[in-house]
Amino acid sequence: ADPSATVGRFRVNVASNRAGRTALADTVAYVAQGADPYAVIRACVAAGARRNGIATVDRRPLPEALSGFGWCTWDSLGRDVSEAAIIEKMEEFRAKGVPVSWVMIDDGWSRTDREAETLIGLDADPERFPRGLSHTVDLLRERYGVRHVGVWAAFQGYWSGLEPNGQAVARIGAEHLTVTSNGCLIPGPSRWQAMMFWATWLSLLRDMGIDCVKIDSQSSMSTMTRGVESYGEATIERHAALDRLVETEMGGAMINCMGMAPESYWHRPVSAVTRTSDDFLPHDPASLAEHLLQNAYCSLVMRELYRCDWDMFWTSHPHARTHALMRALSAGPVYCSDAAGRTDPAVLGPLLLSDGRVPRPDTAAVPVPSALLADPTCAESAWCVTATCGDWRLLAFVGMNPDQPQRIRLHEALRGLPACAGGGERWVVDREAMTAERLRPGADEGSAGPLLAYGESRLYYVWDGSWDAAVMPLGLIDKIVAPATVAVGADDDSGIGTGDQLSDSEAMAVRLAEPGRFALLDPDARCVDVRCNGETVPVHRNGALCMADCDDTRVDIRWKA
């Protein structure tokens, strides 16, 4: 029997996964107590990471290969992926002006026995990729400007392992493999065995031009080896080998997928990205709530270790805009899986810059304190997640109740979050209404906002910083993560200089990520001039929110002292 212990109302069950083991001696859990729920989670995760010798998120930067906008073949083509079908989709992206930075060729590309679900060879299926995978990669890069191309693989080789008499086994060497109790041939548990498996395959993929990978089915390993290998034996060396080799061969550009079991996420030393949910289910719109809840609540822990992948989405979908909003707030890879003819550039516009770069928050969005222990599918208030971007806080509300609309409540969502720096008043910008509202401390917290039906969403920006200046740059307001599109300070001498500042005014220079509609918060109506590349531009004022169309990236703001 698996050992267990109960302390008060807290019960811990411990299992080894290996038959015959009757005693365990190790740290099984970390517990922290405090007023800040995010801080106590962070403390526990940091302790666990130190104990296991793995990096926390601050030492796992998002790989450059996955930082732009991507497209994955899975929900578009499934296992019927081919070079011809990929090129058809790329033609659509080019015609619609969608800048795709990376392409992930998912399950179906490799040489497999589809009935036995085993891996035959380490190369591409010759019928689907008749001129080889490298030809497809070259087309994507040279004809369509795709910068990075990745492929899918399973942690165990393929769903049921490797074909015993296949070319893959001959190339890797049978001595580097092991047979499970039900006859599946998989990479062996020692680091040397796992390294030989992945070194052989990743090296071949690099020769084909592949520079990122998605490794699926990771938490299946302990199930496949149940009774024979403990959780640690099933995962520690296999993950260590994979992580280090992907870091060496591909700069760490890997999506860890279906690896949300503790034996997986506690044993990856350095890889940066992990999926935080089950698959996006595009044909079942009712799955929205479950998908978002999985991602947001799992991110409470995962964002302390990894860059969170909230999975692909469709831009033509009943809840496309809400899915896009949530992917923007994931702080991880952002990619769609649209089928041919189904991409809606209008949904992608707020997510991306014109060159395919993706503005991101500092960390993945998580539920606000008031939502941590509530069931959002039946609550009166709309569900809310929060993420930060510099001194701005983003609040995204989503209707989660399929039976009735839910009310946006800003004061409730902010309760328990850190106060505005310096104890000042909060200002909230409603992105949809393009208005700004002052939230005074002690104001009526019963005041309510709009209603959201199931799948509807609304985004707010909250200034959490100090009031060192009269105006607060928000950024390109047409982009979801607007604060990530502006930086205070400019790197040249254009615009306002000391010679043309008035004695009774002050000024600030900012740099935009690209030209566009720039927004700033001006609570006391002190802004007197906005210049783009030295030229004064018209400013549209809606209360405390000011907006100006800028055709350059250098912007200078001047206000009354």
Language-model-derived ranges and their functions:
Residues 132-156, 230-280, 347-366:
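Active-site-proximal helices and loops of the catalytic beta/alpha 8
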